[in-house]
Amino acid sequence: MSDLQAAEGPGSWSPTARPGSAGGVGDCQGVEGSQAAASENEDLENNKDTSLLASATDPEPCSPPHRPQMVSPGSKDATEDLRKATGALEAQALVKQDLLPADQAQVLNEMAKYQVPQRSGDIVMIQSEHTGAIDVLSADLESADLLGDHRKVSPPLMAPPCIWTFAKVKEFKSKLGKEKNSRLVVKRGEVVTIRVPTHPEGKRVCWEFATDDYDIGFGVYFDWTPVTSTDITVQVSDSCDDEDEEEEEEEEIEEPVPAGDVERGSRSSLRGRYGEVMPVYRRDSHRDVQAGSHDYPGEGIYLLKFDNSYSLLRNKTLYFHIYYTS
């Protein structure tokens, strides 16, 4: 009976709850009562021993008396596994924290391999590894080393031309009509470019022109190129041919592309080669003589453009006089 009580638990078992403890019926009442009393005394003694043993082995101070805490081996294993898992997570977190600076350094090293192309005028600061001094270099020097003879040269600002008109159109055309190479016909859809190199003895270029009956487009540009001859030449081209020629010049300059920058070079270099003195506009050259002058900005070739590309029906007779002064 003591084994059964221990299995059921000493705290939940009560002798008054068992059947037959209150006495029987008939002749068996006395015998059953004495047996019940003996059983009750024995159970009380067993309960006292079990309570003393439970109080000695129970580590929890707040557990109620006579109710020992039963801990299964499975719960102990689960607690131990939880502690191990927590320790492993903490170790992984520490490892990640240790590796984070190294990863960041590796990313920065990879980013440093890709250098951003410097534009003209940017400043490059170089830290010396030996003395700690800071050297300031212009990016133009690096561009010059990379481009060589094809480096981009920013042209100086063009001074505005001096222009005027006068009304003696008939006298002007009559005089130039008798001179050689002072009269030409600009056909419909054509553009005539008169190339005038700078002269070693001159300081400015001057021009005068007039037309018969109709106006014409006129503009002046400057080509920053070395002068090999002082001869004035006339170039006649169709409007489409003129555009194709400009594209060919762009392609020729596109060949020496700066290393590391595929978007720089040709077109910007072409713009840097030609300076605009005055844009092409339609001039009333059939009413007044159009005249002007421009001081030499340096060595190069003036491009005087007479544009009749907008006219699809009429040719224009042009009278012109171009010279230099000191």
From Swiss-Prot:
Residues 239-255 have a biased composition (Acidic residues). Transmembrane segments: none annotated. Pfam families: GOLD_2 (PF13897). Residues 1-80, 238-268 are annotated as: Disordered. The modification N6-acetyllysine is found at K170. It comes from Pongo abelii (Sumatran orangutan). The keyword Acetylation applies. Residues 160-324 form the GOLD domain. Keywords: Acetylation. This is Protein TMED8.
